[in-house]
Amino acid sequence: MTSSYGHVLERQPALGGRLDSPGNLDTLQAKKNFSVSHLLDLEEAGDMVAAQADENVGEAGRSLLESPGLTSGSDTPQQDNDQLNSEEKKKRKQRRNRTTFNSSQLQALERVFERTHYPDAFVREDLARRVNLTEARVQVWFQNRRAKFRRNERAMLANKNASLLKSYSGDVTAVEQPIVPRPAPRPTDYLSWGTASPYSAMATYSATCANNSPAQGINMANSIANLRLKAKEYSLQRNQVPTVN
């Protein structure tokens, strides 16, 4: 065993000398030149990437160290929370509590609003004392009431315009499509004249004339006889008057 171990130890310097020899170094360099990584320039690219990564890491570290936010580490979250709390407090202070009015207060306010939509300071103060409110609350109520009044007016005007447009459109359609009037009923006289023939009308007219002619002849004869009688009487009266010689 000792002899074999000694033989191995003796061979190690020989191997080291063989690797360090110039011929062996040239062989290793030739193998390295023909390797895949050397042919594809992967070794140089890897070295460049590694160097660039080291530079980026160094710059990032310096920027983080130089930033003012990280210098005060645990102070920034606390400051942000304080700012948020202060803003919320301001909003709560600015927000007013909603006032609820009872029926008597609303009646008094509505009566004044019916008289004037813009009461002056004296009227508002007097009204506030009567309804047990502050003058500012009364002023805000009148502002809201005026806005509501304007909204109602606009809605009523819009409804009125819509109804007018609807009626106008209905009139236009009626003019465009007129209804045919029904024929008026004809009188009975017109129907009798229309149905009777002209010959029948002439016959009736001649019959009436024939019926009236005898009466007219008798009247004329009577008048002639009367004239004759009057003439005879006149002649007789003249003959009876004595003549003076």
Swiss-Prot record:
State the Gene Ontology terms under molecular function.
Answer: DNA-binding transcription activator activity, RNA polymerase II-specific; DNA-binding transcription factor activity, RNA polymerase II-specific; DNA-binding transcription repressor activity, RNA polymerase II-specific; HMG box domain binding; RNA polymerase II cis-regulatory region sequence-specific DNA binding; RNA polymerase II general transcription initiation factor activity; RNA polymerase II-specific DNA-binding transcription factor binding
Where are the N6-acetyllysine residues found in this chain? 160
The terms describing its cellular component in GO are: chromatin; cytosol; nucleoplasm; nucleus
Q: Which residues carry this modification: Phosphoserine?
A: 21, 197
On assembly, the entry states: Interacts with SMAD3.
Task: Quote the PANTHER family the UniProt record gives.
Answer: PAIRED MESODERM HOMEOBOX PROTEIN 1, PAIRED MESODERM HOMEOBOX PROTEIN 1-RELATED
What is the role of the protein in this entry? Answer: Master transcription factor of stromal fibroblasts for myofibroblastic lineage progression. Orchestrates the functional drift of fibroblasts into myofibroblastic phenotype via TGF-beta signaling by remodeling a super-enhancer landscape. Through this function, plays an essential role in wound healing process. Acts as a transcriptional regulator of muscle creatine kinase (MCK) and so has a role in the establishment of diverse mesodermal muscle types. The protein binds to an A/T-rich element in the muscle creatine enhancer.
Please identify the protein, giving its name as recorded. Paired mesoderm homeobox protein 1
